[in-house]
């Protein structure tokens, strides 16, 4: 940034000039203010509460008239503006205009700097421009719904899950028998992580890793590396010093080595065309693929675990919907793609989970030039070059104006799968009611179909075997790379065949 640019911004900021244009300009947020849950910027002492950081942008927003209460910006210290929006029209327009063409929005890489340092900068997640376009074309076929939802491949995922589920079921039966209790209190978060990583490594990539090795070695490594990526993004120098003083550098190196070993296992099936490697067509050497494999292993495990954990957590608070899904899956001995996709109650539960508690709670973008965006209802906004954009889908999906009783028949901030029936009855289409659970536009998440397949299998099979009830009356959210239930999905499990 040149001195001239910095000086110009400082003058604008002092004068209170709004750098945005159009008929739905955002309103300004001050850096400091009373009564807010957090400062509106990530700092070493608040970065573990990103949802509260976003909430700070909407402090006193109800005093604004028009679209300024949903589109907010921070402009301080001579730095570029930061636009945070929960306006679904603006979110959709910006995502649709993100890509590699001149004048389109880039993915803002600043929130993922730590991820890039740990996994590589040439990944589909981090790259922009022609590198991103090339990476996207390579993964399109393996991740496609038409490919994953073929019966043979679908059954492969199911068989892996069935073996793991039976192993854990026998362990649970033994524990209940020895204790004499009809239910067992467990945190399901770790078990969900193992199942998701197992299907990803052994089915998708055609590798071979045992349940025990995944649980005891690779899950701890991946979880540690994900936490390290977040810390390394917010305060890299401070974290480096802290590791050296505490001896944490040795721990990091061990987990990094285990993460690399897991990457080796995922790549091992490529030469024989195992798993989905036979759908992957590229002459690139294995070494050139490592960045993407690391991102897929960490990102897909994290996102699908979040998705499944939230679905199970919501159902643990909703016995009525748990019973509805059970009625759909109880007679399914083998899950076929047609049976799975035609289970309306299960699919409503998954859709509502993505709406209320999306794993990816915001999407970062950056304006490469002064850019005009137009919404489907013809509103316009000019976003100045260099603006950091945060598409806040978490708060968008919980906003009463967009998802509340007047629109969907239910309050926006409650889990209500029945709202999707009302949406359909009122003639609203999927395009009208986007929840952005997997993003939108050219940079939507390529793992959408894989996530739906894995999570549908896990949730359906769990309900078929167990009744489960939440231990806590309410379950809060924690957030880092993704969101997840803060209690680790703490439930009381009861075997259905014990009735």
Describe each region flagged by the PLM.
Residues 107-113, 151-308:
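Cytochrome P450 heme-thiolate monooxygenase catalytic core
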Residues 319-321, 440-444, 448-486:
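Cytochrome P450 heme-binding "Cys pocket" and the immediately downstream C-terminal segment
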Residues 484-499:
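C-terminal helix/juxtamembrane-tail motif
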Residues 353, 386, 441, 455, ...:
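Hydrophobic, well-ordered secondary-structure elements that form the walls
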Residues 303-316, 458:
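Short, small-residue alpha-helix embedded
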Residues 2-121, 130-134, 162-163, 385, ...:
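N-terminal membrane-proximal hinge/A-helix region immediately C-terminal to the signal-anchor transmembrane segment
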């Amino acid at each position: 940034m040149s001195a001239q640019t910095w000086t110009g911004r400082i003058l604008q900021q002092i004068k209170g000039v709004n750098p945005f244009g159009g008929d739905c300009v955002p309103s300004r947020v001050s850096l400091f203010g009373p009564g807010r849950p957090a400062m509106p910027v990530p700092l070493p002492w608040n970065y573990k509460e990103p949802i509260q950081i976003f909430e700070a942008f909407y402090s006193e927003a109800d005093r604004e008239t028009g679209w300024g209460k949903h589109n907010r910006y921070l402009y301080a210290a001579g730095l570029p503006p930061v636009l945070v929006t929960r306006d679904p029209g603006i979110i959709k327009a910006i995502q649709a205009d993100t890509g590699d063409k001149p004048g389109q929005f880039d993915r803002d890489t600043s929130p993922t700097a730590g991820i890039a340092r740990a996994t590589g900068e040439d990944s589909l997640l981090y790259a922009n421009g022609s590198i991103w376009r090339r990476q996207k074309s390579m993964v399109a076929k393996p991740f496609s719904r038409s490919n994953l939802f073929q019966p043979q491949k679908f059954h492969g995922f199911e068989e892996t899950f069935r073996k793991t589920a039976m192993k854990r079921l026998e362990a649970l039966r033994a524990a209940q028998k020895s204790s004499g209790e009809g239910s067992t209190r467990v945190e399901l978060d770790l078990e969900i992580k193992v199942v998701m990583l197992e299907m990803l490594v052994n089915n998708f990539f055609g590798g071979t890793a045992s349940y025990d090795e995944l649980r005891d070695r690779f899950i701890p490594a991946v979880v540690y590396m994900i936490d390290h990526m977040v810390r390394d993004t917010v305060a890299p120098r401070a974290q480096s010093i802290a590791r050296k003083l505490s001896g944490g550098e040795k721990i990091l190196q061990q987990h990094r080595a285990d993460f690399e070993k897991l990457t080796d296992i995922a790549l091992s099936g490529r030469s024989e065309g195992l798993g989905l490697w036979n759908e992957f067509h590229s002459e690139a050497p294995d070494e050139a693929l490592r960045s993407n494999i690391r991102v897929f292993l960490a990102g897909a495990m994290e996102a699908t675990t979040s998705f499944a954990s939230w679905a199970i957590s919501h159902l643990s608070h909703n016995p009525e919907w748990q019973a509805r899904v059970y009625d759909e899956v109880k007679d399914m001995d083998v899950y076929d793609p047609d049976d799975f996709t035609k289970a309306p109650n299960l699919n409503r539960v998954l859709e509502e989970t993505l709406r209320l508690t999306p794993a990816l709670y915001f999407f970062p973008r950056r304006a490469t030039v002064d850019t005009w965006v137009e919404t489907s209802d013809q509103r316009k906004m000019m976003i100045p070059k260099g603006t950091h954009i945060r598409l806040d889908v978490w708060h968008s999906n919980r906003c009463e104006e967009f998802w509340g009783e007047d629109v969907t028949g239910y309050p926006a901030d409650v889990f209500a799968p029945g709202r999707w029936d009302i949406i359909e009855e009122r003639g609203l289409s999927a395009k009208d009611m986007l929840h952005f659970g997997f993003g939108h536009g050219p940079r939507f998440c390529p793992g959408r179909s894989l996530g739906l397949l894995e999570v549908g299998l896990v949730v359906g099979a769990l309900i078929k075997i167990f009744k489960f009830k939440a231990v806590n009356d309410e379950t809060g959210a924690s957030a880092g790379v993704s969101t997840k239930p803060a209690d680790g999905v703490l439930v009381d499990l009861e075997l259905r065949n014990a009735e």
